[in-house]
Amino acid sequence: MSYKIEADEIDIHPSVKIGKNVKIKCKSIKLGEFCIIGDNVTIECNKFEAHSWLFMWHGVEVGRGGCNGKNSNVKIGKGVGIFENTVINPSESVEIGDNCGIGADVMIWTHGAWLDVMQGVPHDFGPVKLGNNVWLPARSIVLPNVTIGDNVVIGTNSIINRDLPDGCLAAGTPCKVIREGLYPRPLNDKDLKKLVEHICSDWIDLCISKGITRNIEVWYEKRKIFLNQNSLQTIYYLDDRKIEGHTNDVSEDLRDYLRRRGIKIYTDRFFKSI
């Protein structure tokens, strides 16, 4: 075993994958099915709970500064991605909703104090909450006492020091709302067909570069993607987010490529490309 867990309560699903040199020190740790913890990850807080399909990549650090108190709790929803070298500081609670993407080198802070507060300098302590479907891209910083609503897209290198409403596009230093009520805005069938056909065309080109020589056909019809390999068919249901039919390394490669392009279909298997 190349990782170390110190906890009074441990609830880790058998499917979870944990990388090398991982250090976890919590009173309570819970990891749901198909979570992946990359190499050189540190998690130190009171309680850490992640739903299924967490992707926490190399060098992520959960901790720093007063993370042993009763409020030092981290709760993460389903299908969240947290990428390289991100820092999450849970001096106070941090809650991250379903399907959030947190880019590389992001920092989330729940405390900020250094100089003598008796001299009137700024200081701040408070929880951070991200709603569902939030995209917090690379090198952004979230400061204490911030709540970000559902379906929010934020620009790279932003400093978020105030609450952001549902459905907005926001960016800047400090972060400002550019447009409200922008998301979600579901594509009609015509636009979805155009998007999916473009994605599938790119995937076919990638298959050629990977040396996949099987006879492959892929097309879109009525909010479904059809994949034929010789006489074997796989159907990807975009509304229900499920798969029916034949599955093998090629069908899984397409599922993983769809994930990379923003169409996530979860099954009882990890995403895997050829």
Model-derived features: positions:
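Terminal amphipathic alpha-helical/low-complexity segments used for targeting or macromolecular assembly
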Residues: 1-2, 7-8, 15, 173-274
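Flexible, glycine/small-residue-enriched loop-and-beta-strand segment within the central core
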Residues: 11, 17-146, 173-174, 180-182
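Residues that flank catalytic or metal-binding motifs in active/ligand-binding sites
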Residues: 104, 156, 166
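Contiguous mid-protein beta-loop-alpha structural module that forms a pocket-lining wall or clamp
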Residues: 160-167, 174-178
